[in-house]
Design a protein with these regions (language model features):
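N-terminal metal-binding scaffold of metallo-dependent hydrolase/deaminase domains
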Residues: 1-49
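Divalent metal-coordination and catalytic microenvironments
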Residues: 10, 30, 35, 60, ...
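Conserved beta-strand scaffold positions in the cores of enzyme catalytic domains, especially
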Residues: 6, 53-57, 394
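Active-site-adjacent C-terminal substructures of enzyme catalytic domains
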Residues: 235, 245-362, 374-376, 380, ...
Length: 400
């Protein structure tokens, strides 16, 4: 017998059309078979002859796609609570980084932590996201900055998928920072690119990422890494225009990047390049909030150019120690001016697009049955309220 689940008496936010808001259906039902959505429609139109599927009465609750956190750094050693204090005492993110703190301090902790311990800590972070209805987590490397540790991080990311009911997509972020005392060009050519090649050989890389910024790598250096990614047929994405504008967005767009993330300093010409490339703008309000930034992303230009907007936690130990995608949705509205529809699209349909995935992020026949049922009356509540988890049930691969 096929594995079937029939959900009845439910409101469904399909999130399947950019011009149709939530795509809301009320008094609806949904049939899952073998891990995929088989049918959805009105309760009065439930197909006959279903036999005896497992049934779930949603009691009028809201069903959405399972949420997708499309930008995280949840595999790492240590924490940076002391740097939090330093920032409050007046030190800037760049000053901390140039003094050997920031990303480099996490690199040291991650190198010193064995694979088993990294996994146990990362599982706790994954559990927090899963508890809020997340069904897919993107996880980056980038706290190794050597071949051995970059591969260790990516192996841990892959292991999370085996240990928990969640999908994991990996990004190789070897170009995250310049190791202390190293030359950036030497590092890209002799460490980062060989690490990418080794990780790719092990099947550990779904995308290649980098940090293009004055305190990290310039466009020429990133271009060499992206060129190797292209040769290996690996899609790219980029942290760009977070603290300044040095041309990272246009570079990433020239490689048809899946997504370009942060983008607070992206201007109209950058956004036009993103639109032409089909790249998604991933907004990361947790970092904006934590770093006390003032330059907001040019949301109106993203809208006018029809650039898809995604929202993510950027969960990392330094600039965004935030383990709540629901809070990121709220912040994207209150800090950046997104609408609740845009925030939910940004953590479902557009988040899937930012990862190059077409089998999830919407509620439609043929898509994966990764779903969330919420104790809310209307979809806007998911962005409106914070500090409260309204998740009733999460469905992963068609299973409760």
């Amino acid at each position: 017998m096929p594995n079937r689940l029939l959900i009845t008496n439910v409101s469904i936010a399909r999130m399947d059309q950019p011009d149709d808001g939530y795509g809301l259906m009320t008094h609806a039902a949904l049939l899952i078979q073998d891990g995929k959505i088989e049918w959805l429609g009105s309760v009065s139109d439930i197909p006959a002859g279903l036999g005896e599927p497992e049934e779930l009465d949603a009691c009028g609750r809201l069903l959405t796609p399972a949420l997708i956190d499309c930008h995280t750094h949840i595999v790492h050693g240590g924490n940076r609570a002391r740097e939090f204090e330093m920032r409050l005492e007046g030190a800037s993110y760049e000053e901390i980084a140039r003094a050997g703190g920031g990303i480099i301090s996490t690199v040291t902790a991650t190198r010193e932590t064995d694979e088993a311990a990294l996994l146990q800590d990362a599982l706790k972070r994954a559990d927090a996201l899963i508890a809020e209805g997340v069904g897919l987590i993107e996880i980056k490397s980038g706290y190794g900055l050597d071949v051995e540790t970059e591969l260790k991080m990516l192996r841990v990311a892959r292991a999370i998928e085996r240990e928990r009911p969640v999908r994991v997509v990996t990004s190789f972020l070897g170009a995250h920072a310049v190791p202390k005392g190293a030359d950036a060009d030497f590092y890209i050519d002799k460490v980062c690119i060989p690490a990418l090649e080794a990780a790719h050989k092990e099947g550990l890389v779904d995308a290649v990422d980098g940090f293009c910024e004055g305190i990290a790598f310039d466009t020429v250096q990133m271009g060499r890494l992206f060129e190797r990614a292209r040769q290996l047929d690996i899609p790219v994405k980029l942290h760009a225009e977070q603290l300044s504008n040095i041309g990272g967005t246009k570079l990433a767009a020239s490689y048809n990047a899946l997504s370009i993330d942060h983008v607070e300093y992206a201007d109209k010409t950058d956004i036009a390049a993103m639109a032409k490339a089909g790249s998604v703008a991933v907004l990361l309000p947790g970092a904006f909030y934590t770093l006390h930034e003032t330059q907001k992303p040019f949301v109106e230009a993203f809208r006018s150019e029809s650039v898809p907007i995604a929202v993510a936690t950027d969960w990392n130990p330094g600039s965004s120690p935030m383990g709540s995608l629901l809070l990121a949705m709220n912040m994207s509205c209150t800090l950046f001016g997104l609408t609740p529809v845009e925030a939910l699209a940004g953590t479902t349909r557009n988040a899937a697009r930012a990862l190059g995935l077409k089998d999830c992020g919407i509620v439609a026949p043929g898509k994966r049955a990764d779903l969330a049922i919420w104790d809310v009356l209307e979809p806007a509540e998911l962005s409106y309220r914070f500090g409260v988890n309204p998740l009733h049930r999460r469905i992963f691969g068609g299973r409760l």
